[in-house]
């Protein structure tokens, strides 16, 4: 159960996942169900709510898929990784239960121009290869990657922003002696009509594991 205090929701989540070899790569599948409950002091839906009104006793299907494929071209090792995340709602949802697109964690290339909806998906694709950078005798393994993401959301309520986003990323990451950093540039490629298009963004993330 998940209690969301700002909306007073109680949610039952049932999730399943499967990972298996498929061809030369690894395929992952997931399927889940979320149900808003009346338990634990949750908000109760009143009778006769219009279709556009969000429900506390909602229902939605969650799904996902991923594929990891290593391959070799021109004497160099490459990997292709694709992941799909989505949901299909049976009712209008509160914001905490909607799916959102437009961030470094969903469709890259967007910061201010994100979209949220009752139903939707996002697909992230990365192509990467590795090389070694060795200044002053220190060896740093570098992962170079290019990404192309897309996603779309829909809302049951009329007049709420919805549509599709497409974005791209180009970057490099290093892991060395517990430290990790990632430098990337993300750019928006497509937005819904009427939505302001953002410029490219450069991101730097640094971490350390003890």
Model region roles, listed by residue range:
Residues 1, 187-202:
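Outer-membrane beta-barrel translocator/channel fold
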Residues 1-150, 154, 204-206:
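C-terminal outer-membrane beta-barrel translocator/porin domains of Gram-negative envelope proteins
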């Amino acid at each position: 159960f998940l209690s969301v205090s700002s909306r007073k929701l109680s949610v039952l989540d049932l999730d399943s996942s499967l990972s298996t070899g498929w061809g030369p790569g690894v395929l992952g599948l997931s399927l889940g169900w979320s149900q808003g409950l009346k338990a634990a002091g949750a908000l109760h839906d009143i009778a006769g709510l219009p279709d556009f009104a969000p429900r506390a006793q909602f229902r939605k299907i969650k799904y996902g898929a991923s594929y990891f494929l290593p391959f070799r071209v021109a004497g160099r090792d490459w990997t292709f990784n694709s992941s799909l995340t989505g949901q299909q709602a049976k009712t209008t949802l509160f914001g905490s239960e909607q799916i959102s697109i437009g961030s470094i964690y969903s469709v890259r290339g967007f910061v201010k121009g994100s979209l949220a909806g009752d139903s939707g998906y996002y697909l992230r694709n990365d192509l990467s290869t590795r090389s070694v950078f060795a200044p002053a005798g220190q060896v740093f393994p570098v992962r170079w990657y290019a990404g192309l993401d897309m996603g779309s959301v829909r809302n049951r309520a009329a007049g709420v922003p919805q549509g599709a986003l497409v974005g791209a990323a180009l970057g490099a990451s290093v892991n060395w002696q517990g430290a990790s950093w990632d430098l990337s540039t993300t750019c928006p490629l497509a937005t819904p009509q009427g939505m302001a298009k953002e410029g490219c963004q450069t991101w730097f993330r640094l971490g350390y594991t003890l």
